[in-house]
Amino acid sequence: MSEELKFLGFKKDIVVLDDIIPQEMADSVEEKVIADIFPWYLLRDIEKSKLTEKDNFRVVNDENTVNTLQLGHGIYNMEDVGQEINSNMYAQVHAICDYCCQKFDIKPSYIRQKFNLLGQNSSIKEGKYNTPHIDNRWFNSYSMIYYVNDSDGDTIIFNEMGGKDITKRPDKLTIKKRITPKKNRAILFRGDYFHTSTNPTKSEKRIVLNVNLTDINE
């Protein structure tokens, strides 16, 4: 992917669609990722080192931030390592992503695909959230989140944006939209919005498929 390609501008801002893939496909992916043999890896929502990097303007660490542990499972990543497939779930995940993109009227070029699992965290009180961030260095990209299971733990999208010319982190974040997880719901939003997750406080787990992509038509 070349950053020199002319970007024609975002056609979409924030879009939420329910029942986005066939039910049997939604049931199948949930069944596989909650199986005892599915490989999960312990991570943080954002690496702690990135919070203190003075020239990293893609993360925010404010008074409401809770840097939480999570489990992750990488599927595909071309941002840091070139095109690399990391999982035998690739074919199924790619099919899900293509199906979602068709519904969103996107012709995708994928940057990253991964599963994230958040468990309960007692530090998530009213007004608290996980680390606000922008997913990748391509500010002309979209973020797409597919909710694998029913749970609480909203996704929060902020009004504040990043960009290639940003020289500081936002002084204050204001909430633009909250989206509650629901199985077989997906959201698509501009990749230059700061956004974050919240841990569930009622449900046992919150599982999402997190995807970064560009629209070839833009």
Predicted regions and their residues:
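Ampiphathic alpha-helical segments that act as solvent-exposed interaction surfaces
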Residues: 1-2, 204
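Non-heme Fe(II)/2-oxoglutarate
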Residues: 2-106
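Catalytic core of non-heme Fe(II) oxygenases with the double-stranded beta-helix
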Residues: 86-218
